[in-house]
Amino acid sequence: MIVTGESSGELYGALLADELSALWPDIRLIGVGGERMKKAGVELFSGIASSFGITEAIPTYRSVRDAYRKTVNALKAERPDVVVLIDYPDFNFRVGREARRLGSRVLYYVSPQVWAWRSGRVKTIQKVAERIAVLLPFEEKIYREAGMPCEFVGHPVLDEIGLLPRDKGELRERLGLDAERPCVALLPGSRNHELKKLLPVMLGVVRRARAEL
């Protein structure tokens, strides 16, 4: 079982499903996710439903509650050998506790940013998962020092970047970027609410900067 609740986690879930299916062609994968995971062969019993901020959380509460109920029902009915929880901590912490109570092994994949805020969540993760696989090298030290089995597995996006030229000039040429001018990337986030609220502000800053520089 693979459980995630937002777009970025779903991308990791789809890539993971592809790799698992390549290693074990007969494997059966079920979970919570979106179209990418479905295309990767995961049988979905619930779609993803994430929120960002207080006002956005209100309309999604029912869908999150419904997703949790369906997940618990699937845990009881399917009794998966392994449950992989991808980020989405507030939801997945509850799923992990229930999965372990029912006898499934639990792997947490993609650590919440415990190094940035709410570091106490390390202890919570120790209770809901047996092991954790992290994307950033320094995260491994954090969990190992806390006594939790942990392995640095690298960031999946590097596999995608690996398809691009390593040379900066060649990359700029392929992307149609001026080699002599500074390059700024706008990264508003992966959630719909982030895109709707943050991207217009970022674009406004870019327009203002262009006018003043």
Residue ranges and their predicted role:
Residues 178-185:
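Charged active-site motifs of nucleotide-sugar-dependent glycosyltransferases
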Residues 19, 197-213:
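Short hydrophobic signal-anchor/transmembrane segments that target glycosyltransferases
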Residues 1-175, 187-195:
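Active-site and donor-binding regions of nucleotide-sugar-utilizing enzymes
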